[in-house]
């Protein structure tokens, strides 16, 4: 997936082994899958979508094969899955979206994962500012729908 490659390039530029993505918009950007409870971990060579039972089947069907989908719940916490994935990939330097997390959540992730988090929110601002072809097509389609809706109601207004 091209977006994962761009994220990995950003990780290399920042000297990080991985990024923990908790912001829903950035999760969707990275995986193409929209969900509200969980996280995405992107390392230099792997990607993990970690979610609960509500989304597990849809995630497994929707994401590309280069993203590993795992489920938390039933005795396994999200932080455990993140730590296991980090251990599998040898992650030492972990980035996180410092503006998307409360200060308490940021400190809690550091504590439960046993690593210092490195701020990297600007990576996603930079990557998401430049639109790929699929995003441009979606924006054009949305514009056409909005214009048609306006034309349909303009005579009523």
For the regions a protein language model found, what residue spans apply to each?
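N-terminal accessory/capping or targeting/presequence segment of soluble
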Residues: 1-84, 142-149
């Amino acid at each position: 997936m091209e977006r994962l490659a761009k994220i990995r390039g950003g990780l290399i530029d920042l000297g990080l082994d991985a990024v923990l993505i908790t912001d829903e918009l950035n999760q969707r950007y990275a995986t193409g899958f929209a969900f509200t409870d969980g996280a995405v971990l992107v390392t230099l060579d792997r990607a993990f979508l970690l979610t609960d039972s509500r989304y597990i089947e849809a995630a497994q069907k929707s994401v590309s094969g280069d993203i590993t989908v795992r489920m938390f719940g039933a005795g396994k916490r999200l932080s455990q899955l993140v730590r296991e994935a980090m251990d599998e990939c040898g992650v030492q330097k972990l980035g996180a979206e410092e503006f998307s997390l409360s200060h308490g959540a940021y400190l809690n992730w550091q504590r439960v994962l046993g690593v210092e988090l490195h701020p990297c929110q600007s990576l996603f601002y930079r990557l998401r500012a430049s639109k790929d072809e699929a995003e441009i097509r979606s924006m054009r389609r949305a514009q056409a729908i909005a214009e048609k809706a306006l034309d349909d109601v303009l005579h009523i207004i």
